[in-house]
């Protein structure tokens, strides 16, 4: 009896999503990138890279940027449909009473740890981090901000917190910051599809609606396929 040869799944392309946990426009983009991840799950692998938007040896209090956010958050809501929570906005409108000192490093380390447990759920975890900050008003520089997410994703607490404070994982987060710079990303959110070698197709720069991102992805994949046919 003759058997049919096993069908191998086509190789997936890599979409790199550059974001920062403290980027309000990335928070607004979260529903878009989550929808993209689901719609293209058979065609794309997605790698989320933290960009290190707010980094300083001595982090500044939220008051330094509060007046800007007081206006900017409304623009993000109007354009994206996302909502910022009252617990987050309390810190923005009461900066003199807030104990927040935003810094991108700890949430970047947290994402780096998470990717080792659930590499296929990077987009969801990044979105959950931003929801914890921007809606629930959790301080991402505080270890306790991550505890509920550890329960949600069933990540061992001791393992997570050991890594969160380790030099090794800090260096891994710093490597991601450097990689984002190497990709010449100058703002967030940014999404790129890797073609061959060091060639990339930009599919989102700044907040971009789903239809536009989807069209850009389709065009990029067609161009990559066409280039492969020409070179073969």
Q: Model-predicted segments: where are they?
A:
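Residue-level recognition of the N-termini of beta-strands and the immediately preceding loop/turn
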Residues: 13, 44-46, 189
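A generic fold-level signal
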Residues: 10, 105, 185-186
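C-terminal cap of thioredoxin/glutaredoxin-like
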Residues: 17-18, 22, 29-38, 128-232
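Extreme N-terminal starter segment of soluble prokaryotic enzymes
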Residues: 10-16
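Structural alpha/beta surface segment adjacent to cysteine/selenocysteine redox centers
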Residues: 30-133
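A broad, low-specificity signal for short, low-complexity segments enriched in glycine/proline
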Residues: 6-10, 70-74, 110, 149-154
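N-terminal leader/targeting and pre-domain segments
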Residues: 2-4
